[in-house]
């Protein structure tokens, strides 16, 4: 055995069983590549990535832990998202959530995102 080696059991391993999953079409309108990690709250990614943030609220990329998806400028691609598990609390990142990722906090998230978008427009 090699240190860190993973030897899976025979058969298939089902990941994220019972969690809600969605597909989201993402368009990158910025001028620099953007990389999003596996456990980042997808609704809070860079504003140069355009997609339905309401649909992505409380979701992360459905990819292996420690990996990422890269978005090149001008690129449009569909990604698979899965519900964030655990205590379902998000703090930090872009500061648009800072609390529970539930239906009750969705309006607050959308308002925070809009305020940050308006500030960015004013700076241009």
Curated annotation (Swiss-Prot):
Q: Which GO terms describe its biological process?
A: urea catabolic process
Its Gene Ontology cellular component terms are: urease complex
Listed under catalytic activity are:
urea + 2 H2O + H(+) = hydrogencarbonate + 2 NH4(+)
Q: In which pathway does it act?
A: Nitrogen metabolism; urea degradation; CO(2) and NH(3) from urea (urease route): step 1/1
- Pfam families, per this entry? Urease_beta
Q: Which InterPro entries match?
A: Urease_beta-like, Urease_betasu_sf, Urease_subunit
**Enzyme Commission number(s) of this protein:** 3.5.1.5
The primary location reported for this protein is: cytoplasm
Q: Which domain of life does the protein's organism represent?
A: Bacteria
Subcellular location as annotated: Cytoplasm
Per UniProt, the enzyme's principal EC class comes to hydrolase
PANTHER family (alphabetical): UREASE
User: What family classification does the UniProt entry report for this protein?
Assistant: Belongs to the urease beta subunit family.
Q: How does it assemble?
A: Heterotrimer of UreA (gamma), UreB (beta) and UreC (alpha) subunits. Three heterotrimers associate to form the active enzyme.
* Identification of the protein by name: Urease subunit beta
Q: Which organism is it from?
A: Halalkalibacterium halodurans (strain ATCC BAA-125 / DSM 18197 / FERM 7344 / JCM 9153 / C-125) (Bacillus halodurans)
């Amino acid at each position: 055995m090699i240190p860190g080696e993973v030897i899976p059991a025979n058969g298939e391993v089902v990941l994220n069983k019972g969690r809600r999953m969605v597909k989201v079409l993402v368009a990158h309108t910025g001028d620099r590549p953007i990389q999003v990690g596996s456990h980042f709250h997808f609704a809070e990614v860079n504003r140069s990535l355009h997609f339905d943030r309401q649909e992505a609220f409380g979701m992360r990329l459905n990819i292996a832990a420690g990996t990422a998806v890269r978005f090149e400028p001008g690129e449009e691609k569909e990604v698979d998202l899965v519900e964030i598990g655990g205590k379902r609390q998000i703090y930090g990142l872009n500061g648009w959530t800072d609390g529970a990722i539930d239906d009750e906090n969705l309006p607050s998230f959308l308002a925070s995102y809009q305020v940050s978008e308006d500030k960015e427009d004013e700076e241009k």
